[in-house]
Amino acid sequence: RQRVEELSKFSKKGAAARRRK
């Protein structure tokens, strides 16, 4: 369950970073 929460945060941060680029 902890990995899912980390993946969810990483996915949101990754999408924001990809949109900024």
Swiss-Prot record:
Q: Where is this region: Disordered?
A: 1-21
Q: Which domain of life is it from?
A: Eukaryota
State the UniProt keywords alphabetically: Antibiotic, Antimicrobial, Fungicide, Secreted
Enumerate the subcellular locations listed in this protein's record, separating them with semicolons: Secreted
- Identify the stretch annotated as signal peptide in this record: none
Compositional bias (Basic residues)? 10-21
Job description of the protein: Strong antimicrobial activity against several Gram-positive and Gram-negative bacteria and fungi.
Which protein is depicted? Misgurin
Q: Tell me the lineage of the source organism.
A: Eukaryota, Metazoa, Chordata, Craniata, Vertebrata
